[in-house]
Regions:
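C-terminal region/appendage detector
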Residues: 1-242
């Protein structure tokens, strides 16, 4: 390896969206973080880390699907939870309206609520199982502490200088696997747009945003402006030679 650059993951995610200034909203398996940037530099007062992420959603589904028999190391259960998350879960635009819709729906009327386990057994999913990603917008409903992801993004922007807030609100970049749930980016946009009106809010959501760190790093690797920040093998040997 001729040279290496240790970089901020959230900064790389920002670059993958083609931005230098904006707010990165990153939610993966173990962490949910919000970080504003201006001209590629992090605005520390707006940095936020939330206490829930994708693993909490998985645990919720494990417990609700398998109850006292749940075992996160059971391959059958792992496959069931992963498939449910990918194929059935989504973010509603309004939780109350969605629950009212399900309440008035006859049993078996919506085939999307049905799921076949790996052994072929048919299971009828409950509304809250399908709406589990609501966790990121209403954590208290699921017994989790702290502000919602959208509120954290609002607070992050509000913590920055007033002159930067309109620019930050109009350049929000969600990334990480949890942001891929259907309805996620639309819900985030609607909440931001409502909060910051009449400032225009915009959400930059690329289709490969679960790989945003890698994509941004690939961009940086080809920029000559960053060459001075790389640590070469010769410099490493000179500085850290035992």
């Amino acid at each position: 390896m001729p040279s290496v650059l240790l970089a901020d993951q959230l900064e790389m995610s920002l670059y993958s969206s083609g931005l230098l200034t904006g707010v990165v909203v990153d939610s993966g398996c173990g962490l949910t973080r919000v970080q504003p940037f201006h001209l590629g530099r992090p605005l520390r007062p707006g940095a936020t880390t939330l206490e829930f992420a994708g693993q909490d959603l998985s645990v919720y589904l494990f417990k609700s699907l398998f109850k006292e028999d749940y075992n996160r190391h059971n391959l059958f259960q792992l496959d069931t939870v992963a498939s449910t998350q990918m194929r059935k879960c989504y973010v509603p635009q309004n939780l109350g309206d969605e629950l009212d819709f399900y309440q008035n729906l006859p049993d078996g009327a919506d085939e999307r609520n049905s799921y076949h386990l790996p052994d072929g057994t048919a299971v009828e999913l409950t509304p809250m199982q399908r709406l589990a990603p609501e966790m990121f917008f209403s954590p208290q409903v699921f017994g989790l502490q702290g502000p919602s992801l959208a509120q954290a993004a609002m607070d992050s922007i509000e913590a920055c200088e007033a002159s930067l807030r309109p620019l930050l609100a109009s350049h929000v970049a969600p990334c990480g696997g949890n942001t891929l749930y259907p309805g996620f980016t639309m819900r985030l946009y609607q909440l931001l747009a409502s909060h910051f009106f009449p400032t225009k809010a915009s959400v930059f959501a690329g289709s490969n945003r679960h790989f945003s760190v890698w994509l941004g790093a690939s961009v940086v690797a080809h920029l000559s402006t960053y060459k001075s920040e790389w640590l070469t093998k010769e410099e490493y040997d000179e500085r850290f030679r035992l």
